[in-house]
Every structure is written in C-alpha cells, then in structure tokens.
Regions:
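Single-residue signature of alpha-solenoid repeat helices
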Residues: 3, 37, 75-76, 109, ...
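Generic helix N-cap/helix-start motif at coil->alpha-helix transitions
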Residues: 15-21, 52-61, 87-95, 126-133
Length: 171
C-alpha cells in the first residue's frame, strides 16, 4: 500500500500529467467521443491545479460541454463546486446556464445567462451576447412568457435561429 501512496504522491507532484490528460481529453472531445473525453477530464481535474492557468480553465469548461454532449447533464451540476474559482467569466456563466437549462432549472439558467451578458469579454463568440439572449428567449418562450421571449430574441442581432423563433411566434 505504501508503494501506491508513494506513486500517487509522485504523480501529484508532476505538473505535466494533468496537462497530458487535458490534451488526451481534448482530442477525444474534438473527435466527438464525449464519454472518453469525460474520463480523461475527470482524471485531470483530480490534481491540485491552478485555476488561473488557461488550460485549466479550458479543461473545466470543455469537461462541462463533454458532460452535456454525453447526456450527463445531472453530473455536470458538480461544476457548482468550482463556481468560486471559475464563475467570473462569460464562458463559465454561459456553460452553467446550459447546465441548469438541461437540468430544467430554468430560473437559475436565466440568472447565469444574464450574468454572461454583463461580462465584457468572452473566449467563445456569442456567449456574452446573442447566444445568451437566444437561450433566455427559449426559456421564456417555453414558460409561456412570450413578451419577454420576444424581447430577448430581438436582442440577438439577426441570429437566424432567433429570427425563426420570432417568425413562429407571429403565426
């Protein structure tokens, strides 16, 4: 047992291992093998990581998307546990909005999408503008709040799916 503890301690000290696990996970994610990606992201996040490193931020966010894409939206709720470290970006707020939306936690989803809208910068295009507005519109439409839905669809700046929703609402 002590040999295993010693090996685990060595792995914990080697800062290259989480990055290699991240690269493997990202490769599986890009190949749309989301379940395999999740396994490697999970292993990579086991390590004590610096949440300010760019690859760590990307690992957390991409893991969330991999969980959603592999039908594990309920498991993705664990990202609430790292909200304090990562919740200061439009990308993470948008991701949490999607996670809440997929778990039918619509009020929480709207709160997160609105937080994303207030953020000045984003890494993924649209998460702090038209995509957040679109998802808020979808939620309001599904809840029967058509006036609010229309307002948010109109804020999407010509985003085609929002335009189609507006057309359907007029029928």
């Amino acid at each position: 047992m002590k040999a295993n503890d010693s090996l685990a301690a060595k792995f914990q000290e080697d800062t290259r291992i989480p990055y290699v696990l991240y690269q493997l996970a990202k490769s599986y994610y890009m190949a749309a093998e989301y379940t395999k990606a999740c396994a490697y992201f999970d292993c990579g996040l086991y390590f004590d990581l610096n949440p300010r490193l760019e690859y760590v931020i990307d690992m957390v966010e991409t893991y969330g998307y991999a969980l959603l894409n592999s039908g594990q939206a309920d498991h993705a709720l664990f990202l609430e546990n790292v909200y304090e470290e990562f919740g200061n970006t439009a990308d993470f707020n948008f991701l949490m909005g999607l996670i809440y939306m997929n778990n039918e936690m619509f009020d929480a989803a709207v709160v997160e999408f609105k937080k994303a809208l207030k953020m000045p910068e984003e890494r993924a295009r649209g998460v702090n503008s038209y995509l957040a507005c679109y998802n808020i519109g979808v939620i309001y439409e599904c809840l029967g709040q058509m006036t609010e839905a229309e307002q948010y669809y109109n804020r999407c700046g010509g985003y085609e799916p929002a335009e189609k929703r507006l057309e359907n609402m007029k029928k």
